[in-house]
């Protein structure tokens, strides 16, 4: 019984990988600057502190840069980018109908809605 369960679990994992399905994930950064790259699905990404580079890729992503001078790229999909942390950030929403919460000092491109 255990072998059958293990075999079925392995087969399911192989099918997911082979089909190219990217499962959505939650990413949380640290207080150091880092590069965080999402999946091809709808992700939730929080850069936390530091000067981060965040790339959402495909899917309707929710991206929050946090404290620091962040570079945030939404990619394809209807993304929500939160960049109103008081630092001068770079926000590029990408393709899709995107919403960006930004400060007056942020450099913003490709966002259909700015708040």
Task: Please provide the spans of the model-predicted regions.
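Positively charged n-region of N-terminal signal peptides that target proteins for export
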Residues: 1-5
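Short helix-onset patch at the extreme N-terminus, typifying the N->h transition
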Residues: 6-9, 30
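Bacterial N-terminal signal peptides
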Residues: 8-17
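Alpha-helical transmembrane bundles and membrane-interface segments of multipass inner-membrane proteins
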Residues: 13-14, 26, 30-35, 53, ...
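N-terminal segments that cap or nucleate solenoid repeat domains
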Residues: 22-58
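Glycine-centered beta-turn/loop sites at beta-strand termini
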Residues: 29, 38, 47, 56, ...
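Leucine-rich solenoid repeat scaffolds
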Residues: 82-115
């Amino acid at each position: 019984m255990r072998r059958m369960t293990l075999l079925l679990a392995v087969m399911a994992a192989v099918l997911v990988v082979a089909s190219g399905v990217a499962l959505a994930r939650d990413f949380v950064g640290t207080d150091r600057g880092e590069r965080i790259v999402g999946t091809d699905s709808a992700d939730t990404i929080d850069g936390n502190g530091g000067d981060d580079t965040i790339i959402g890729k495909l899917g309707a992503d929710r991206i929050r840069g946090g404290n620091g001078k962040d570079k945030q790229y939404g990619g394809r999909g209807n993304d929500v980018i939160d960049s109103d942390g008081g630092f001068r950030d770079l926000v590029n929403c990408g393709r899709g109908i995107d919403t960006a919460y930004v400060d007056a000092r942020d450099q913003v491109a490709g966002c259909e809605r700015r708040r």
